Amino acid sequence: MQNLQGMLRDQRVAQDLQEVIFSIELACKDIAKKVQLGALAGVLGATESENVQGETQKKLDVISNDILKASLAANSNVLALASEEEDNVVAANAGGRYVVAFDPLDGSSNIDINGQIGTIFTIFEALDGVAANSGKHFLQQGNKQVCAGYVLYGASTLMVITVDGPTSCLTLDPATQTFSLTNTALQVPDQTQEFAVNLANERFWLPKFKSYVADLKLGEEGVRGKRFNMRWNASMVGDVHRVLMRGGIFMYPSDTRNPKQPAKLRLLYEANPMALLIERAGGKAFNETQRILDVTPCALHERIAVILGSEQEVATCLEYLN
């Protein structure tokens, strides 16, 4: 069975980019070990600090962030880093060709209940003539990503990745600590009968989106004429992985709860990498008005509405909204 190195070699990925991906792989293997040990490793519970998002940091958030930073900073091909847990860009190595952004541990509310969590990452080529610690490197459209992926720490540890080809899935063998290719090209079904959305926010939704979800819930007797099941993991990695494996639509729309912050998910290291993975698997990924990968970021931690998944269902949702 082919390993990650063999897969990248067959795809003729540039050697320096391969090395950056291997640094992410190494870090995620370390994180996976700590996740598996849980309370035995003393990594559960919260810290007394908040990140730039105003969110209370879990111990494993901080540990995962430190592991990824150390692994990537040790790679001479990495010019700079950006993380959900860091206020600003972190300069790494002068002369590095790539910049890497990541959410070190998505779904951290699931940590203490042994639920699904994961690491999301994206890689861009650094801009010429721009200082290493400049945010400009990261304000590129998502269609400029040279690699995107996530590692899901679940019943098995999986890496889902796309470089310059399909969205592929690799499974970690805990005995050999090797990621082996188990699905060469994931394909999202065009149609679905599953949706993922946080219904607790329904009272804050805009009327058109509320109408769309209401019709999903009506089942066979409603205008959609079929039964839909709702699934919600409170982890973007877990919910998007399900969509990639068997279809569905994942939605985190804008809402009115906080007028200064109408969206929840971050464009750079959540929406963009997931959008690329979904599109390379035949699905669609939009905010409420345009393709996510065509959005030009304005800020490092910019937030955006996300609607992604099976092509026909995303199109139907957008018809309601527009």
Swiss-Prot record:
Pathway as given in its UniProt record: Carbohydrate biosynthesis; gluconeogenesis
Keyword field: Carbohydrate metabolism, Cytoplasm, Hydrolase, Magnesium, Metal-binding
The encoding gene: fbp
InterPro entries: FBPase_C_dom, FBPase_class-1, FBPase_N, FBPtase, Fructose_bisphosphatase_AS
Family per similarity comment: Belongs to the FBPase class 1 family.
Binding sites annotated in the UniProt record for substrate: D106, G107, S108, S109, N198, K264
Main location: cytoplasm
Listed name of the protein: Fructose-1,6-bisphosphatase class 1
